[in-house]
Amino acid sequence: MSAVERLVVVGGGGFGRELIGHILDVHRAGGGPAAGGYLDDGGSDVLARLGYDLPWIGSIADYVPRDGDLFALGIGSPEGKRQVVEKLQARGARFAQVIHPTALVTARTSIGEGVVLGPFTGTGTETRIGRFVTVNSYSGFGHDSEAGEFTTLSAHVDVMGFAKIGSGVFIGSHASIMPNVKVGDDAKIGAGAIVYRSVPAGATAYAPPAKLLKRR
């Protein structure tokens, strides 16, 4: 990314702000430029009101990429990612991978366009990560596992060996996908779930919620 004129973060919400920090960490480690601006349909006040000095350069709905722009996808929702990427790519946008300097990535990992690997994430040998997959802090993939495009892993998710995650899947924090399990496209896995059996496309699987045993 050293020859890129400007790295633009797409989205100024919670994950977009986290991504700005990840990009700064990459920059400080000598791996690429700092963010040069952001896009958000909420206008220029989205980050300014929180004290950020990163310039707002336009809305996602209207911005037309210029020569040298490279985009980093700061959106967590699988469906939101898909919609935004389709809009921007139709106008010629190119997307960067953002791989945090603390991520442990094996040499035999395949990583697609627009993937974000957050702090202390990891991959095993023969891992395949599709386009625009988001992997939040402390999440990891075992050997021979895969995740399809636009999938999102929240923090502390464990995808074990030979597990296959489809496209557009959302996995909540501290969930574990056991070895050889398949999760179908557009499924949702709740926080803390331990997935022993395959999950059909479009289904939702979740762990029992905490129960109140005693009141004061």
Over which residues does each language-model region extend?
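Cofactor-binding loop segments of dinucleotide-utilizing enzymes, especially the Rossmann-like FAD-
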Residues: 12, 40-41, 100, 208
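Short hydrophobic segments within beta-strands
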Residues: 9-10, 39, 74
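Active-site catalytic pocket residues across diverse enzymes, especially alpha/beta-hydrolases
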Residues: 23-27, 88
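NAD(P)-binding Rossmann-fold cofactor-contacting core
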Residues: 26-48
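Left-handed beta-helix
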Residues: 77-131, 135-145, 157-159, 163, ...
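Glycine-rich adenosine-cofactor-binding loop
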Residues: 4-23
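Glycine-rich hexapeptide-repeat left-handed beta-helix
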Residues: 12, 137, 149, 154-216
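Phosphate-bearing ligand-interacting subdomains
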Residues: 43-104
